[in-house]
Amino acid sequence: MSVRDIQSSLLDMYQIDVSEGLISQATEGILEEVKAWQNRPLDNIYPILFLDCIVVKSREEGRVCNRSVYLALGVTMEGQKELLGIWIAQTEGAKFWLGVITELKNRGIKDIFIACVDGLKGFPEAIESVFPDTQVQLCIVHLVRNSVKYVNWKDRKLICEDLKSIYTSATEQEAEMALDAFGRKWDAKYPTISQMWRRNWQRVFPFFDYPEDIRKVIYTTNAIESLNRSLRKIIKTKGAFPNDASILKIFYLALSHIAKKWTMPIHTWKAALNQFAIRFAGRFEV
């Protein structure tokens, strides 16, 4: 939202005429708040880290271009969701992600047990170079989301149910059998779905080595989807942002509002924490 947009909204909604200069001065204060928030100290350990990306439009030298807005969402030892930072980039890659992960480490993170990513190019290598003991796992929520991206609405429910039979399997072997069954049922109509799962299987199958309580936290944590839905509602009417600073302002304010609702720990967190204590005993802090 530009300064002129804010000025117009205030006039339309409240019949208040505020100068562009005053609005600019007020919103510049938000950037200082964002800077302090983005540099705040973080916890020593985050059992789970999720990374997500939203693509928005931004103006640059008179033309509209894509900007990727990356969000890092951590789950604390208390089971609370915490947004760790916002980063804006034209492209993703190993160098970009190495900078992000190094920044998180410099802000105090000493260990991440499981990092859930969306097949982001260069991210697994970056996190493994900074946190070599972290298990990088393809995010099941993202994988399902990408699977149904081009599926007809009438087929989505059935597709999701059949995909669930894969990621809720008790063992990797059972999951492979479920994937084979999925392929036999759907490959004629949607061949790319089973192909995508097989192509990414190396980053999926470690999931089946986790105890059920940890698995539930990974695939039922809907914070990523909630963030996406809430943010898209805000940005879908904005058109192109005037610059990167305006993207930061809007996302920060929106995310601050969303985070106020994160008052309770993740459901079944105590059971998951006990399993983390067993599985990562040498790295676990009481």
Regions found by a protein language model. Give the residues of each.
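Conserved beta-strand -> loop -> alpha-helix junction used to position metal-binding or nucleic-acid-contacting
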Residues: 114-121, 126-162
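Short, charged amphipathic recognition helices of the HTH superfamily
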Residues: 1-10
